[in-house]
Amino acid sequence: MPYRLIKKEGAARRGEFQTVHGTVQTPAFQNVATAAAIKGGLSAHDLKEIRAQVMLCNTYHLHLRPGDKLVAEMGGLHKFTKWDGPILTDSGGFQVFSLAKLRHITEEGVTFNSHLDGHRIFMGPEQSMQIQANLGSTIAMAFDECVENPATYEYAKNSCARTARWLLRCKDEMNLSLIHISEPTRP
């Protein structure tokens, strides 16, 4: 997904990048569809009418409900939402931060207690990429840890280093996932 710079003025810049689901002009507002539905009842048609470019869906929440495997069986998020434009899925990393009282972080990944029913869930870089591949994401984000504020310098430094290591694992897993997706159905 090469980025093309169109114009720059001071620190501001305008550009675009191509995806298999269309061109994205930047900067871009991403319409949030946490559970694959835009709040306020906007449809895919409505999004086109307001010239929306990207739908942002939440990996963690979709993994829990309705389930990434069910979404895959239904043809992926594009068919599930009837949206043919680019879909960005977050990694689940924000939940590492937002569910702080319900999680345990290790080098392997994060163990959560579901906010829905308390059952234990493990998500690491590989699982995050597998879930995003199941969802049929156009733009998949690498699994990361959002550090709390305030945090000690040492904690932030260690978290940043762990996130960089997780990025390499995400890249390896995504490359493996793409091998198993045939070109015509590739997200």
Protein language model regions, located:
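Non-catalytic, usually N-terminal nucleic-acid engagement modules in DNA/RNA processing proteins
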Residues: 1-177
